[in-house]
């Protein structure tokens, strides 16, 4: 069913289709839906798309390049930022496309993610000072969120409030 939804969104002018992700955190016994935020201008700063839900036409890779294998932690963010900055056409389908568990490579080494984030941001025209500031801000924000997630009841309550606003 998920593949049919992706196929329906792929009109001839669309290069990339993204959807939503069922995020599973087995350690904290949590499940919630993470939506791809189609705030594409932010791609040069942060990954606003749920990368496992992104389906890319082969022609997009041929036009704008492949993953930069010199990056280890945020090559997906680099790729999507590059595609966007070079004119790729993104489409969003408001459906859960994949289920994903917490604990990927980018969760394991915040310092390396920060360093690569500066590289990707500056490649996409962000001044280095702004890239560093935004990276530090995001690091503090993620620590706060992680602390809240450790408090299951509070996280469930806050997530319920957020869901009601959307």
What are these regions, as identified by a protein language model?
Residues 9, 120-124:
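Alpha-helical structural signal in soluble globular domains
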Residues 6, 73, 149-150:
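A short, hydrophobic/aromatic-rich structural module that often spans a beta strand
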Residues 23-29, 50-57, 125-138:
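Low-complexity, flexible helical/coil segments
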């Amino acid at each position: 069913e998920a593949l049919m939804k992706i196929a329906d969104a792929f009109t001839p002018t669309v290069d990339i289709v993204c959807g939503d992700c069922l995020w599973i955190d087995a350690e904290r016994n949590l499940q919630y839906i993470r939506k791809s935020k189609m705030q594409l201008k932010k791609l040069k700063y942060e990954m606003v798309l749920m990368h496992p839900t992104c389906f890319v036409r082969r022609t997009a890779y041929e036009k704008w390049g492949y993953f930069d294998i010199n990056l280890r932690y945020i090559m997906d963010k680099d790729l999507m930022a590059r595609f966007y900055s070079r004119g790729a056409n993104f489409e969003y389908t408001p459906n859960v496309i994949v289920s994903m568990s917490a604990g990927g490579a980018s969760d394991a080494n915040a310092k390396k993610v920060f360093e690569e984030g500066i590289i990707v941001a500056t490649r996409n025209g962000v001044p280095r000072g702004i890239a560093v500031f935004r990276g530090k801000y995001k690091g503090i924000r993620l620590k706060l969120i992680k602390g809240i997630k450790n408090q299951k009841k509070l996280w469930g309550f806050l997530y319920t409030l957020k869901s009601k606003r959307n």
